[in-house]
C-alpha cells in the first residue's frame, strides 16, 4: 500500500492521470518504458503495468506495436458536448435544491444538460470530480469551491480548464489564488453587519459570534460582525467568537453554548454563521433553560426553511434560485464570448435583513 492508504498501482495511476490533465505530460508525448517507470517510482513492473492498463482503458494513453506508449489527446473532443457541470458542496438539502433548480432552468432553456456533483465540502472529491469532468468532456462549469479559505492545491486543474478554454464560474466562494476568475458572490460581510447592527440597535451589548473558519463566507461574515461592533464602540473580544470547521459543525456549536453556561459568561446576543447553526444554538439554549429572545437574541443567515419554522429566525436573505439563474446566465455569456465590460449579470448580491422572533418579541 502507498503512504496514503491506496494500492500502489492505483496511486501511480492517479498521479499520472493528474500529470496528463494538468499538461505536465502532453498529448502525443512518449511515456518512459515499464522498466524506466519501475525504476523512477521504485515499483515492480507488474505494479506499473497494472497502472498503465487502467490509464489505457480510460483512454489516457495508447500503445503502438514497436513504437511504445504515448499520451492520448483526451481533451481533443472536449467541446460541443452540450453538458455543463455543476459542482456544489451539497445537493439535497438547505438552500441547494432551489439554487440548482435556478441553474437548470436557464441552461435547459438554452439547450444544455447539467451534470451534478456533490463534494461534501471535500477538497479531495472536488479534485477527483474535476479530473473526471475534464476527461469526459464538458462545455462549462459552475462550481462552489470546497473549503474556500484553505490553500487550493489543485489549481493546475483549473489551469487545464483555462488552457482548453472551458469557462467556469465560482459561486458563494472564491479561492484566494483565483480572485480574478468569474464569480457570483453574496455580500457576506454586509449581511453579517446588518444582523449584528440589528442586535446592537435592539439594546444587546454582549454579543457572541459563531463562524465557519474554512470557507470564505465564514471569514467575511466575521468581518461584518467586527465592523458593527467597532461602529458601536464595543471592544472586540476573541473569547466571544466560536470558530468551527466542516468536520465539527454538527457538534461544536452546541458544545460551546454549554461551555458558556458553565462559565457563567453568557452573551445576550449570538450571531450565527447560518440558519442551520442558529437552530443548533437555539435548541441548546432551550435545553440550558434560556429563553429566546428574552435572555438571548439569536440570528442566522440564508433565510432557509429553518428560518421560517416555529418562532422564526432573524436572518439575511439568500436569493437561492436567483443566484443559480445569475450563475447560469454569466456562464452563457462566457460561452458566447461576451466581454466582462458588456456583461449584464450582477456579480455581488446585496443583503436584506429579515427580522423574526428569535431576536425580538413578536407578540404572538
Language-model features and meaning:
Residues 14-15, 254-364:
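Flexible loop/turn connectors
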Residues 108-118, 209, 228-250:
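Short beta-strand elements in bilobed, periplasmic/extracellular small-molecule ligand-binding domains
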Residues 179-209, 227, 250-258, 278, ...:
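Hydrophobic alpha-helical segments within soluble ligand-binding/sensing domains
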Residues 94-109, 191, 217-236, 280, ...:
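Short, solvent-exposed amphipathic alpha-helices that sit
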Residues 193-234, 341-359:
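An alpha-beta-alpha
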Residues 27-29, 206, 236-240, 292-297:
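Short acidic capping loops at alpha-helix termini that bridge into adjacent secondary structure
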Residues 4, 14-18, 72-194, 262:
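Alpha-helical recognition/docking segments in bacterial nutrient-uptake
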Residues 1-78:
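N-terminal helix-turn-helix DNA-binding module of bacterial transcription factors
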Amino acid at each position: 500500500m502507498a503512504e496514503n492508504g491506496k494500492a500502489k498501482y492505483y496511486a501511480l495511476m492517479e498521479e499520472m492521470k493528474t500529470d496528463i490533465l494538468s499538461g505536465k505530460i502532453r498529448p502525443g508525448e512518449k511515456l518512459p518504458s515499464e522498466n524506466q517507470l519501475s525504476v523512477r517510482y521504485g515499483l515492480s513492473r507488474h505494479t506499473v503495468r497494472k497502472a498503465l492498463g487502467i490509464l489505457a482503458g480510460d483512454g489516457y494513453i495508447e500503445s503502438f506495436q514497436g513504437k511504445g506508449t504515448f499520451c492520448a489527446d483526451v481533451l481533443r473532443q472536449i467541446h460541443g458536448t452540450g453538458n455543463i457541470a455543476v459542482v456544489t458542496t451539497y445537493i439535497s438539502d438547505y438552500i441547494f435544491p432551489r439554487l440548482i433548480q435556478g441553474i437548470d432552468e436557464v441552461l435547459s432553456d438554452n439547450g444544455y444538460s447539467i451534470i451534478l456533483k456533490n463534494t461534501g465540502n471535500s477538497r479531495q472529491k472536488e479534485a477527483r470530480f474535476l479530473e473526471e469532468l475534464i476527461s469526459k468532456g464538458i462545455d462549462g462549469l459552475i462550481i462552489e469551491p470546497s473549503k474556500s479559505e484553505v490553500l487550493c492545491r489543485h489549481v493546475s486543474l483549473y489551469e487545464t480548464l483555462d488552457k482548453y478554454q472551458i469557462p467556469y464560474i465560482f459561486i458563494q466562494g472564491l479561492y484566494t489564488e483565483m480572485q480574478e476568475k468569474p464569480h457570483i458572490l453574496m455580500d457576506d460581510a454586509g449581511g453579517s453587519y446588518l444582523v449584528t447592527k440589528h442586535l446592537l440597535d435592539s439594546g444587546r451589548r454582549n454579543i457572541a459570534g459563531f463562524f465557519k473558519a474554512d470557507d470564505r463566507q465564514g471569514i467575511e461574515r466575521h468581518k461584518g460582525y467586527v465592523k458593527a461592533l467597532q461602529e458601536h464602540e464595543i471592544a472586540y473580544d476573541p473569547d466571544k467568537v466560536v470558530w468551527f470547521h466542516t468536520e465539527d459543525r454538527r457538534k461544536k456549536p452546541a458544545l460551546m453554548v454549554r461551555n458558556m453556561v458553565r462559565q457563567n459568561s453568557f452573551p445576550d446576543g449570538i450571531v450565527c454563521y447560518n440558519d442551520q447553526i442558529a437552530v443548533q444554538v437555539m435548541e441548546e439554549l432551550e435545553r440550558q433553560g434560556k429563553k429566546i429572545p428574552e435572555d438571548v437574541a439569536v440570528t442566522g443567515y440564508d433565510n432557509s426553511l429553518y428560518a421560517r419554522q416555529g418562532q422564526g429566525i432573524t436572518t439575511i436573505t439568500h436569493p437561492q434560485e436567483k443566484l443559480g439563474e445569475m450563475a447560469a446566465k454569466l456562464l452563457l455569456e462566457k460561452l458566447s464570448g461576451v466581454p466582462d465590460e458588456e456583461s449584464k449579470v450582477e456579480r455581488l448580491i446585496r443583503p436584506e435583513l429579515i427580522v423574526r422572533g428569535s431576536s425580538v418579541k413578536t407578540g404572538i
